[in-house]
Amino acid sequence: GGVGVDAAEMLVRCGIGNILILDSDAVSITKKNRQLLALESTLGHQKSEVMAQRLKDINPQLNLTVIDEYLTPENVEELLSPHKIDFLVDAIDTLSPKLALISYCVNNKLPLISSMGAGAKFDATKIKIADISKSFNCPLAYIIRKKLRKMGISKGFKVVFSEELPQRDAIIEMEERNKKSQVGTISYLPAAFGLIC
């Protein structure tokens, strides 16, 4: 999505020759404000396929593995263990798979950097990298820390987060079932998180 696409592209442009991308989402019109892949010509296409095409266009010799599946606590090991991964960039924005991925990496001593929340924030100069235990002013990082502590993990991996306090007017209350609020995201911030990852 907004973070992972930019992270993957910059890694390929830096000369990294082996990349694995995992994403099961389709490109949607609601992402056009912040995702590099979200264009009229790509709407409805699988993000992993569009990204694979883009990365191969940058480096035709790229050794690229594409996994077009939704990562869950139940399948994280099955999806990742067959691959030799030297470093992992976590750009997941959904809590359960994010926790599963972080836990898998920490428990298997796989180095990673995890992107925290860019929603309701605007100031790119406030982006920081720190151990998860040192992150602050980020509601997503707070929840991640709390849930990971219950899993016996309190530190040991880097996160990209913003020290900016969330802007309350960027949070919209929703009346839809199973959705309490929607957090607005400015176009450039997820990309900045991805570049820093």
Positions of predicted regions on the chain:
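Adenine nucleotide-associated cytosolic modules
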Residues: 1-197
